[in-house]
Amino acid sequence: MKCGWREGNQIQLLENGDQFYPAVFEAIAQAQQKIILETFILFEDEVGKKLHAALLKAAQRGVKAEVLLDGYGSPDLSDAFVGELTSAGVIFRYYDPRPRLLGLRTNIFRRMHRKIVVIDDRIAFVGGINYSAEHMSDYGPQAKQDYAVRVEGPVVADILQFEVENLPGQSPARRWWKRHHQAEENRHPGEAQALFVWRDNEEHRDDIERHYLKMLTQAKREVIIANAYFFPGYRLLHAMRKAARRGVSVKLIVQGEPDMPIVKVGARLLYNYLVKGGVQVYEYRRRPLHGKVALMDDHWATVGSSNLDPLSLSLNLEANLIIHDRTFNQTLRDNLQGIIVNDCKQVDESMLPKRTWWNLTKSVLAFHFLRHFPALVGWLPAHTPHLAQVPPPAQPEMETQDRVDPENSGVKP
């Protein structure tokens, strides 16, 4: 399957769970025929229970619902939580679950990291937000900053077709009428052009990265990238510096208060290379950054699940939406500029690691390890990931007046 640019879409930016969850739950409540939901993490907390209730109500009124969770990201849902959904008819699957070894999860690599919802063939959501309370702004200092989009329009058919082709037990019909054409700058704000792109471990290994590289090559005035886990390869780093050196304002927002300390260490290894190449680097200090968004000039933007690190670019299953629309671009720019002004600290010379022989050695070793990490993982014993469907709980055998006790055989008096 290969998608082309689709015109005439309405796309709404959603910030954090505060905006994302109500929009998703409302769309599920309006579903008439089919719901498909994929996510990396679903916790059995307040947010997870609200999603559970919305899916349960939809299934009880006859809507066909399918849920795909990652076997590493969502390993601890209770049997009762899942069983109530499957009993109502929800098809519930885990992507490549594996038993723990000495209490540790071993299925770390090649994860299903997409976050997608499709409602009938009318509405879709794509982004980086999981289903857990930590995506709500009132969660506290560890609340995550993140983004998703709500989409209506022709591109929803592409997202649905992608899901149908990647779920088992379905036979998608070919859409011979689908148009493929080059995107042009949208002259009608609000009528967005959109392209659905994804990363897999087969024919689309570098599709998302290629669109980032193309964007950096074509940028004329401005690029803003906000990415939670930033440690890309040489090509993307070189493209960022090259754009900055030809006069493009290149701004990078990374985690200043990361949820994993190694993230900060990894990103700071790149500060010398980027800052001295003209890239403006900002550390987001308000709380952990979990977003994966970018914009270019006044019309290009992307929102999705893909980080710019070895796991997302070389191993995980990811999905992004690329958008050509001046109105959406301006909305995202206003949001990111507000973050830069109010919640970020720009990396200056005083924050750069000192260029000692020890720091240089650490940087070189760490950079090359992370750069070659996907190839090293590739040498591990390969297997075909599988989707494990959770069966409905077994129904207890019903006692009836006509049942015969095997120890007291005979006819009913």
From Swiss-Prot:
<feature type="active site">
    <location>
        <position position="297"/>
    </location>
</feature>
<feature type="domain" description="PLD phosphodiesterase 2">
    <location>
        <begin position="285"/>
        <end position="312"/>
    </location>
</feature>
<dbReference type="InterPro" id="IPR030872">
    <property type="entry name" value="Cardiolipin_synth_ClsB"/>
</dbReference>
<keyword id="KW-0472">Membrane</keyword>
<feature type="active site">
    <location>
        <position position="120"/>
    </location>
</feature>
<keyword id="KW-1208">Phospholipid metabolism</keyword>
<feature type="region of interest" description="Disordered">
    <location>
        <begin position="388"/>
        <end position="413"/>
    </location>
</feature>
<feature type="active site">
    <location>
        <position position="292"/>
    </location>
</feature>
<feature type="domain" description="PLD phosphodiesterase 1">
    <location>
        <begin position="108"/>
        <end position="135"/>
    </location>
</feature>
<comment type="function">
    <text>Catalyzes the phosphatidyl group transfer from one phosphatidylglycerol molecule to another to form cardiolipin (CL) (diphosphatidylglycerol) and glycerol.</text>
</comment>
<comment type="similarity">
    <text>Belongs to the phospholipase D family. Cardiolipin synthase subfamily. ClsB sub-subfamily.</text>
</comment>
<dbReference type="InterPro" id="IPR001736">
    <property type="entry name" value="PLipase_D/transphosphatidylase"/>
</dbReference>
<protein>
    <recommendedName>
        <fullName>Cardiolipin synthase B</fullName>
        <ecNumber>2.7.8.-</ecNumber>
    </recommendedName>
</protein>
<dbReference type="GO" id="GO:0032049">
    <property type="term" value="P:cardiolipin biosynthetic process"/>
</dbReference>
<keyword id="KW-0444">Lipid biosynthesis</keyword>
<keyword id="KW-0594">Phospholipid biosynthesis</keyword>
<feature type="active site">
    <location>
        <position position="113"/>
    </location>
</feature>
<keyword id="KW-0808">Transferase</keyword>
<keyword id="KW-0443">Lipid metabolism</keyword>
<keyword id="KW-1003">Cell membrane</keyword>
<feature type="active site">
    <location>
        <position position="115"/>
    </location>
</feature>
<dbReference type="InterPro" id="IPR025202">
    <property type="entry name" value="PLD-like_dom"/>
</dbReference>
<keyword id="KW-0677">Repeat</keyword>
<dbReference type="Pfam" id="PF13091">
    <property type="entry name" value="PLDc_2"/>
</dbReference>
<feature type="active site">
    <location>
        <position position="290"/>
    </location>
</feature>
<dbReference type="GO" id="GO:0005886">
    <property type="term" value="C:plasma membrane"/>
</dbReference>
<dbReference type="GO" id="GO:0008808">
    <property type="term" value="F:cardiolipin synthase activity"/>
</dbReference>
